[in-house]
């Protein structure tokens, strides 16, 4: 089974930058999108062979997630936990016979960590949710998690320490998740890979110079470890300030 996750930073814009060509070439069974910034009724493009599910923010043109899947899920849900988490379109859970798929766009802690308190609540509630799902069947959790876990996961860790996405608090929450029976598939297969990033600022030619961060992940239940065949960053794919990430896992 082949899965793609991509923060498209506005799907309508990405459609004009080769999105459908990429989908055709990727030949993925499941495509998870973050930061779609659109509603399902605005999706005028054709995507034959895929069932499409959307979770849009209450605020137009903001946030949003989508899942395109060749196999129709048993069920699809669009929220978790308390009502506070249900207004920004940040999560879709698709249940399949043998696993849960969770597509997520994690809230950014924002400049000066203004939203860190909410981010911490999100992380705690989501970890509890993922652990509950994992008691029932294995979980594939993917998306833009808005955190570089270790120093190896961004170009300039020293100057970014305490910045949003690399604060001790955010990194610690990912450590807690990985200590709860989950693995970072990219690091499981590529423990020492350097200069492997999935997001680059639009400033200062950061992408051309590969001054980036790895903040997009496929995280899976520990018991799926031996079924992971490939976990890659598709850094050559343009269309957003993020690139897609890929997981191939034995069905």
Indicate residue ranges for each PLM-predicted region.
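N-terminal, active-site-proximal structural segment of metallo-dependent hydrolase catalytic domains
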Residues: 1-47, 51, 57-63, 78, ...
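Active-site-proximal beta-strand elements of phosphoester/diester hydrolases
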Residues: 1-9, 98-110, 142
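Active-site beta-strand/loop signature of hydrolases that rely on acidic residues for catalysis
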Residues: 7, 23-41, 101, 130-151, ...
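Metal-dependent phosphoesterases centered on the DNase I-like endonuclease/exonuclease/phosphatase
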Residues: 30, 51, 122-211, 215
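Structured beta-strand-rich core segments of catalytic domains in phosphoester-bond hydrolases
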Residues: 37, 42-109
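Conserved beta strand-loop-helix elements of the APE1-like EEP
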Residues: 60-75, 203-226
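Active-site beta-strand termini and strand-to-loop segments that position acidic
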Residues: 70, 94-97, 221-222, 247-251
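Surface-exposed cleft-lining segments at the edges of enzyme active sites
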Residues: 81-82, 107-123, 158-162
């Amino acid at each position: 089974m082949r899965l793609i996750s991509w923060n498209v930073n506005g799907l309508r814009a990405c459609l004009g930058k080769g999105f459908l060509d990429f989908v055709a070439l990727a030949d993925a069974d499941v495509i998870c999108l973050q930061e779609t910034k659109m509603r399902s009724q605005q999706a005028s493009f054709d995507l034959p062979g895929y069932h499409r599910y959307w979770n849009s923010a209450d605020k137009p043109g903001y946030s949003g997630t989508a899942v395109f899947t060749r196999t129709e899920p048993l069920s699809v849900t669009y929220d978790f936990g308390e009502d506070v988490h249900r207004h920004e379109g940040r999560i879709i859970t698709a249940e399949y016979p043998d696993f849960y798929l969770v597509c997520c766009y994690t809230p950014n802690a924002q400049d000066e960590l203004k939203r860190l308190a909410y981010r911490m609540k999100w992380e705690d509630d989501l970890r509890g949710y993922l652990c509950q799902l994992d008691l029932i069947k294995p979980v594939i959790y993917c998306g833009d998690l808005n955190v570089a876990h270790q120093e190896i996961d961004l170009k300039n860790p020293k100057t970014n320490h305490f910045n949003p996405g690399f604060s001790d608090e955010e990194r610690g929450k990912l450590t807690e998740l990985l200590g709860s029976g989950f693995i970072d598939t990219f690091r499981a297969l590529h423990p020492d890979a350097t200069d492997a990033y999935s997001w680059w600022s639009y400033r200062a030619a950061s992408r051309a110079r590969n001054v980036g961060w790895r903040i997009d992940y496929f995280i899976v239940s520990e018991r799926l470890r031996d079924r992971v065949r490939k976990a890659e960053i598709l850094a050559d794919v343009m269309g957003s300030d993020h690139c897609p990430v890929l997981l191939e896992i034995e069905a």
